């Protein structure tokens, strides 16, 4: 676990296991960014339209958000948690997340 994780009580997440168990990866980058490369099987729901696209994400699934660097995915996590999604993880940048799954 990282120093920041220890300081702020954040637990480490096994993204590979979550994906194997059926987690949905939501990539909140723009369609153009998504077309330039993405994680196989991920769903592209841009942050600016996420609120109107919530019906496309099952509430009974674990959700992992990702973007280019982790900023938009953090915002997306907040949107999803506020909408009642129970298990949501900020996977950060998509390339980093891809290396973890």
Tell where the protein language model's regions lie, with residue ranges.
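Rhodanese-like catalytic fold shared by cysteine-dependent sulfurtransferases
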Residues: 2-24, 31-62, 71-101
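Short cysteine clusters
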Residues: 67
